[in-house]
Amino acid sequence: MNLHEYQGKQLFAEYGLPVSKGFAVDTPEEAAEACEKIGGSEWVVKAQVHAGGRGKAGGVKLVKSKEDAKAFAANWLGKRLVTYQTDANGQPVSKILVESCTDIAKELYLGAVVDRSSRRIVFMASTEGGVDIEKVAHETPEKILKATIDPLVGAQPYQGRELAFQLGLEGDQVKQFTHIFVGLAKLFQDYDLALLEVNPLVIKADGNLHCLDAKINIDSNAMYRQPKLRAMHDPSQDDPREAHAQKWELNYVALEGNIGCMVNGAGLAMGTMDIVNLHGGQPANFLDVGGGATKERVTEAFKIILSDDNVKAVLVNIFGGIVRCDMIAEGIIGAVKEVGVKIPVVVRLEGNNAELGAKVLADSGLNIIAATSLTDAAQQVVKAAEGK
């Protein structure tokens, strides 16, 4: 689950980290009032969506009057913001963050993720702030500085000082950076985060450090023990198909291809997507129905896949272990009838009751293509998607 920038900054402020004075508003009139409350002669207004690249898309603007802030809010509230990180439909804007203007001297980067290889929280820092950090890591990896956090003792001040010196900070800036570093580490652990970024972390004209942005992603597996963060969830930012899948305990991720995939098991699902790619196809989704798939869940999975207008064919790849292939076959037949599937469906069944499942499909009289192997399934579904 992601948080909006204004929500992330609220958490930063609770941990004593330096953030701009600002207000999240949902009407143009409130935007003008926020400028009055903040004071000054210049403000930054930002459309709040769960995506980066807002500035280039016109979703961030420096304004010099309350009227301009009001006009910006009127222009964006209720609209959809399309950036390089969203799909073609963009994300709906229901909040505008109005905050004080910051005089920037230099931009840095500071972030943290859970590193699976070391099984530790790893902090990353760079002098290349304000830009796409993935691009920096790819083109100039030597500019990415790292600090690994020991889970037994947590982040230590000396680690913050080491990073500060490597970033070229000096004097009181080292103390400020260490305070921010330790505070972010505590925030990361307290709230079960999966990713945290301050991009940019800026050095202001007066030499002080300031958190100018906040990006927070929470580990969904830990949401049951984070009621405060659950209350911050903005469902308008969710993909409706992914939200539908979550209700049925289906693991679904929308992609940009035209071949729908329904598989039981995450590993098999990834392998299925790979072999579809290998044979020239493009998966439209990742969908794992899980080991305890039921007829109802298979039906809902079909509904989710077919809600994507780009899907031209569906590949169902089931390995029967816990789940019986004949039951899956009945679910497929029920779903095809209930949903009214008009596109080709290729099915590969292996394992528990696979032969019985194949017979159930054959006796159904429906236009379902049976595959003899995974390779055959991939080849058949790619041909079907191409209309061959």
Curated annotation (Swiss-Prot):
InterPro entries: ATP-grasp (IPR011761), ATP-grasp_succ-CoA_synth-type (IPR013650), ATP_grasp_subdomain_1 (IPR013815), Succ-CoA_synthase_bsu_CS (IPR017866), SUCC_ACL_C (IPR005811), Succ_CoA_ligase-like_bsu (IPR005809), Succinyl-CoA_synth-like (IPR016102). Mg(2+) binds at residues 199, 213. It is an enzyme of class 6 (ligase). ATP binds at residues 46, 53-55, 99, 102, 107. It holds the Pfam family ATP-grasp_2. It catalyses: succinate + ATP + CoA = succinyl-CoA + ADP + phosphate; GTP + succinate + CoA = succinyl-CoA + GDP + phosphate. Substrate binds at residues 264, 321-323. One of its GO terms (cellular component) is succinate-CoA ligase complex. Keywords: ATP-binding, Ligase, Magnesium, Metal-binding, Nucleotide-binding, Tricarboxylic acid cycle. GO terms for molecular function: ATP binding; magnesium ion binding; succinate-CoA ligase (ADP-forming) activity; succinate-CoA ligase (GDP-forming) activity. Pathway: Carbohydrate metabolism; tricarboxylic acid cycle; succinate from succinyl-CoA (ligase route): step 1/1. Its EC number is 6.2.1.5. Binds 1 Mg(2+) ion per subunit. Residues 9-244 form the ATP-grasp domain. One of its GO terms (biological process) is succinyl-CoA metabolic process. Its cofactor is Mg(2+). Succinyl-CoA synthetase functions in the citric acid cycle (TCA), coupling the hydrolysis of succinyl-CoA to the synthesis of either ATP or GTP and thus represents the only step of substrate-level phosphorylation in the TCA. The beta subunit provides nucleotide specificity of the enzyme and binds the substrate succinate, while the binding sites for coenzyme A and phosphate are found in the alpha subunit. NCBIfam families: PRK00696.1, sucCoAbeta. Heterotetramer of two alpha and two beta subunits. Belongs to the succinate/malate CoA ligase beta subunit family. This is Succinate--CoA ligase [ADP-forming] subunit beta.
